[in-house]
């Protein structure tokens, strides 16, 4: 009982000084601090900052109380209480222990406050950048477990329990379990705060991930706020499962983002890509079908480029299209074919008039009417008759007298009209002989009237002149070959005409009149028929062409020989003859 006054004296001045009664009772102080820090309202996620402020105020108040408690043993030691020194040593020891406990509680409160501020800062970053928060989630949870005082300083809590047990046993037996209750209040409070914060963060991030990636909400399996009384192992396992689900969601989202080249916040783009892919495949499948269709306008050369241009533009819109190389080759081949055909026509038209006459005029075409020519069918000789005649007279050169009378009518105009009247009488070599077949020798007369227009500048004082030209054709015989009749080339057609022209020269007479007259006579006289198997002599086509047509061709810059040859080829059509002559000047590229 002697030890109670010093205890009362040491306690009552503390009450009189205005200090809280909790300064002498560390158990009640620990309960107040843990009660101020532990409860966290799950419904209001923004209430963490006021709780952190409350924890700071509680830690400051406890620090002040601990300092005053350190001064209490000094105030309690008086000269009258020297006998109570052994009993006062116990409060001094308890005060030092309470100071250590206060320091540990202050450090833990500061760490919890820093953790709460870190959660607030992290929550703001989550609101600003969802993707960054999701990437750093596992690291953040690992950091929380690393700096938490429960994991770092487990010895401090044990020291607190060991130091508080003697004092509680001394005062009363009822609060003997107070240190264990303090530890039970403190440790579940910290775990409750940690798990509630983790649950809220997991729920928020799980909902956002479900909205972004369309995955099931990982927060459904998390621990709700009302189940703080569950065992620690189950709580940690649930938190770890939530973290693993978040990590799996993040890894799948990052993999999908790197594969598709899109951000995590654009899931609609990832959905639209496979939606558009079938249509693109259909387009790619329809392009070769369009390319297989023949291009329109490939026949017409002016419209070819337009058709190819339209085809190229449509294929570029569709996407990957083949270049129009095949169509270009087809167009080139069609153009080349057309040019070859034109070249063949030009080659045929560029042949000399005599060669054209050889091809067209044969012995089989004697019955065809050429202008005003009339041929008697009885004048045809058979090949057997001619062979018989040649065998009877092998060494006799047969000469057929042919009288050609040429009458030239000169008008007053520069264009002179010359009318040639030729009376040719052909008589067979053996007129009075009879052959084995008994066919009589026939005589025929071919009357040809030809009208030829010659461009000249003769005056009106020139008179009509008549030229007599004797032509002696030769019959060429061959051994074992078919006999053929040819007309000998005229040696000098206008010898007499030139002699008369020099006696009476005209002042405006052109110097090329001789050539013009010679060219006019050559197409009808200078004809050599090739060997043929036909029967009978070759009848030359007449030159009964209008003077206007010949004049038109001559004015185009062509010679009379070319004009007559072209008219012979086309059958007297002046337009077609002029077109043939003009086509000769076209150069075909090779």
Swiss-Prot record:
Q: How does it assemble?
A: Interacts with YRDC.
- Which controlled-vocabulary keywords does the entry list? Cell membrane, Golgi apparatus, Membrane, Nucleus, Transcription, Transcription regulation
Q: Which residues form the UBA domain?
A: 544-584
Q: Which PROSITE patterns match?
A: UBA (PS50030)
Source organism lineage? Eukaryota, Metazoa, Chordata, Craniata, Vertebrata
Principal subcellular localization: membrane
- InterPro entries annotated for this entry? UBA
Q: Which portions of the chain have biased composition (kind: Basic and acidic residues)?
A: 162-179, 188-203, 380-395, 404-420
> Transmembrane segments in this chain: where?
none
- Say if the entry is tagged with keyword Cell membrane: yes
Q: Which residues form the signal peptide?
A: none
The species is Oryctolagus cuniculus
Top-level lineage group: Eukaryota
PANTHER family in UniProt: DNA DAMAGE INDUCIBLE 1 HOMOLOG 2 (PTHR15397:SF3), SODIUM-GLUCOSE COTRANSPORTER REGULATORY PROTEIN -RELATED (PTHR15397)
Chain positions covered by the region annotation Disordered: 1-116, 144-234, 277-331, 359-466
Instruction: Name a GO CC annotation attached to this entry.
Output: plasma membrane
Tissue-level expression reads:
Highly expressed in renal outer medulla, renal inner medulla, duodenum, ileum and jejunum. Moderately expressed in renal outer cortex, renal papilla, brain and liver.
Described by its record, this protein's role is as follows: Mediates transcriptional and post-transcriptional regulation of SLC5A1. Inhibits a dynamin and PKC-dependent exocytotic pathway of SLC5A1. Also involved in transcriptional regulation of SLC22A2. Exhibits glucose-dependent, short-term inhibition of SLC5A1 and SLC22A2 by inhibiting the release of vesicles from the trans-Golgi network.
Biased segments, Polar residues type: 16-35, 150-161, 362-376, 451-465
Asked if the Swiss-Prot or TrEMBL record annotates the protein with the keyword Transcription, the reply is: yes
Subcellular location per the Swiss-Prot or TrEMBL entry: Cell membrane; Nucleus; Golgi apparatus, trans-Golgi network
In what ranges is there compositional bias, type Low complexity?
78-91, 313-331
Q: What is this protein called?
A: Regulatory solute carrier protein family 1 member 1
């Amino acid at each position: 009982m002697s030890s109670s006054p010093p205890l009362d004296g040491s306690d009552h001045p503390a009450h009189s000084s205005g200090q809280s009664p909790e300064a002498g009772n560390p158990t009640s102080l620990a309960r107040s601090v843990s009660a101020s820090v532990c409860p966290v309202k799950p419904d209001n996620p923004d209430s963490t900052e006021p709780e952190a402020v409350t924890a700071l105020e509680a830690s400051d108040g406890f620090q002040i109380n601990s300092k005053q408690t350190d001064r209490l043993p000094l105030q309690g030691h008086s000269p009258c209480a020297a006998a109570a020194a052994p009993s006062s040593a116990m409060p001094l020891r308890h005060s030092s222990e309470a100071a250590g406990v206060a320091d540990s509680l202050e450090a833990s409160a500061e760490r919890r406050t820093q953790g709460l501020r870190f959660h607030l800062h992290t929550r703001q970053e989550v609101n600003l950048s969802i993707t960054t928060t999701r990437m750093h989630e596992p690291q953040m949870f690992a950091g929380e477990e690393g700096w938490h005082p429960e994991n770092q300083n487990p010895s401090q809590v044990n020291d607190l329990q060991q130091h508080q047990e003697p004092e509680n046993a001394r005062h009363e037996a009822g609060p003997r379990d107070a240190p264990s209750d303090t530890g039970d209040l403190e440790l579940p409070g910290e775990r409750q705060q940690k798990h509630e914060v983790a649950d809220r963060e997991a729920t928020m991030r799980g909902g956002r991930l479900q909205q972004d990636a369309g995955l099931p909400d990982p927060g459904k399996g998390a621990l709700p706020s009302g189940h703080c009384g569950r065992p620690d192992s189950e709580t940690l396992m649930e938190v770890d499962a939530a973290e693993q689900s978040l990590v799996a969601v993040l890894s799948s989202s990052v993999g999908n983002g790197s594969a598709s080249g899109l951000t995590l916040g654009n899931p609609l783009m990832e959905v639209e890509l496979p939606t558009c892919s079938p249509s693109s495949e259909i387009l790619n499948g329809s392009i070769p079908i369009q390319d297989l269709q023949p291009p329109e306008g490939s026949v017409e050369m002016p419209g070819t480029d337009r058709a190819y241009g339209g085809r190229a533009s449509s294929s570029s819109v569709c996407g990957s299209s083949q270049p129009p190389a095949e169509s270009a080759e087809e167009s080139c081949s069609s153009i080349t074919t057309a040019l070859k055909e034109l070249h063949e026509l030009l080659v045929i038209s560029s042949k000399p008039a005599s060669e054209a006459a050889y091809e067209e005029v044969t012995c089989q075409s004697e019955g065809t009417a050429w202008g005003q020519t009339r041929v008697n069918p009885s004048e045809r000789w058979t090949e057997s008759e001619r062979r018989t005649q040649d065998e009877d007279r092998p060494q006799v050169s047969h000469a057929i007298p042919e009288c050609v009378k040429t009458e030239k009518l000169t008008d007053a105009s520069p264009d002179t009209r010359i009318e040639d009247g030729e009376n040719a009488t052909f008589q067979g070599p053996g007129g009075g002989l009879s052959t084995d077949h008994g066919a009589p020798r026939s005589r025929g007369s071919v009357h040809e009237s030809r009208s030829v227009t010659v461009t000249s500048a003769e005056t009106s004082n020139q008179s009509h002149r008549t030229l007599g030209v004797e032509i002696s054709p030769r019959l060429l015989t061959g051994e074992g070959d078919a006999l053929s009749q040819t007309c000998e080339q005229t040696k000098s057609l206008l010898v007499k005409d030139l002699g008369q022209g020099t006696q009476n020269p005209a002042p405006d007479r052109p110097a090329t009149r001789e050539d013009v007259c010679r060219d006019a006579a050559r197409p009808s006289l200078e004809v050599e028929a090739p060997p043929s198997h036909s029967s009978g002599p070759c009848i030359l086509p007449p030159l009964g062409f209008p003077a206007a047509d010949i004049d038109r061709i001559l004015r185009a810059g062509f010679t009379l020989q070319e004009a007559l040859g072209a008219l012979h080829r086309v059958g007297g059509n002046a337009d077609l003859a002029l077109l043939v002559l003009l086509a000769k000047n076209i150069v075909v590229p090779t």
